[in-house]
Amino acid sequence: MQAERGPAGNRCRMGVTVEKAERAGVETSHARRFRNFVGRSLVPKSPVLLSLRNYILLTPPVFALRFHLRRLYWRLTGHKLQQLVKGQGVESGFVAEKVLPYNLGNINIINRGRTERVIAILRSIRGLKLGALNTLVVGPRNEAELLLLSSYGFDPAKLTAIDLFSYSPAVRLMDMHELKFSDSSFDAVYSAFVITYSDDIPKAVAETIRVAKDGALVVFVYEHLALGAGNRFGKNNLSNGPDDLLALFGANAGHVFWKEDFESEGSYTSSVVFRLTKPKA
């Protein structure tokens, strides 16, 4: 017996297809309602609670052990400490002669508090999927910041870190004033306690804008002193806090998720999280 052909047969097949689609839609709707009921009424989910694995990895003894074992591993496998020098990766004498030696002296310090406070802000932004972001991390000093970011939701495979020195393959040698990346390469740029070491902040900002995508998440945190006091190297960069930094981004600074200038004992910690906007080509 042949299947019915012609307009009537087509209508029959279309009717079956529509019926199947409607049934699938009803089943999906029921499944969604059930998940919502379980997730909201029976076992409410937390949007910020860590997995048991990551909780254990972040406990102080375990985290410190991970950090030091990785440092030892890179040393034993022949990854020697490398650094940029003036004329070979760094053009600024100020950065090469003052900033680099100072930060090299602090290469073994783990600043968990500073990093985790910033991460807490990011994890509070509704709908932000940290693991999906191809992120540039500027100036981590060592692997601690990268371990923290990955333990709190960033995908380690999508983290690209740069600094003036490095003992790890996870951190590339590069100056934030001259980034070796193509335009619009990153979904996010994370720069914590780095920008005020610059003696040419507008250039560093311009490079950030260049390598970030339109709509990228931009995160800056830094310390500055009271107006006129000068910083550790005699400069007083961004003395008016996040407003000064946002002014440098100008029209490229879009929606601001977070902005703070916190004072403690005469020193200020500024933090700002915003969307980068770029003019349409």
Predicted feature descriptions by range:
Residues G230-F257:
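Conserved Class I S-adenosyl-L-methionine
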Residues H177-V189:
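A short acidic, Gly/Pro-enriched loop at the edge of an enzyme's catalytic core
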Residues F257-A281:
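Core SAM-dependent methyltransferase catalytic element
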Residues P202-D214:
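A short glycine-rich, Lys/Arg-flanked "PGG" loop and its adjoining helix->strand segment in the class I
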